[in-house]
UniProtKB/Swiss-Prot annotation:
Protein name per its UniProtKB record: Large ribosomal subunit protein eL31
Keywords noted in UniProt: Ribonucleoprotein, Ribosomal protein
Domain of life (superkingdom): Archaea
Complexes and interactors: Part of the 50S ribosomal subunit.
GO CC list: cytosolic large ribosomal subunit
InterPro entries assigned to the protein according to its UniProt record, in alphabetical order: Ribosomal_eL31, Ribosomal_eL31_CS, Ribosomal_eL31_dom_sf
GO biological process per UniProt: cytoplasmic translation
Lineage, uppermost ranks: Archaea, Methanobacteriati, Methanobacteriota, Thermococci, Thermococcales
Record Pfam families: Ribosomal_L31e
GO terms assigned for molecular function: structural constituent of ribosome
Family statement drawn from the similarity comment of this UniProt entry: Belongs to the eukaryotic ribosomal protein eL31 family.
Length: 90
């Protein structure tokens, strides 16, 4: 069941899934991409806008040590027939 436009939902994104699959120095950039893909899949969104607070949390400990999981708040909006998900820290 997709999220209705205007509805807020809390997700816990499991970043640990990709940590061992990529080189250490690529972990934070790959984690940011993974968050975008994961939210797009679970919120059924065409576009995902990640807030600066989420990006700073991913990069907080450097490129090699992103957090294992991330608790985020997702708000889905609909404009011009596209579903846009805005992601911020919960």
């Amino acid at each position: 069941m997709p999220i209705k436009p205007g509805e807020e939902v809390i997700f816990v994104v499991p970043i640990n899934k990709i940590k061992k699959r990529v080189p250490r120095w690529k972990r934070a950039p790959r984690a940011a991409r993974f968050v975008r893909e994961w939210i797009a899949r679970h919120a059924k969104a065409d576009e995902v806008i990640i807030g600066t607070d989420v990006n700073e949390k991913i990069w907080e400990r450097g490129a090699e040590k992103p957090p294992g999981k991330l608790r985020v708040k997702v708000v889905v909006e609909e404009s011009e027939g596209k579903r846009i998900a805005r992601v911020s820290l919960a």
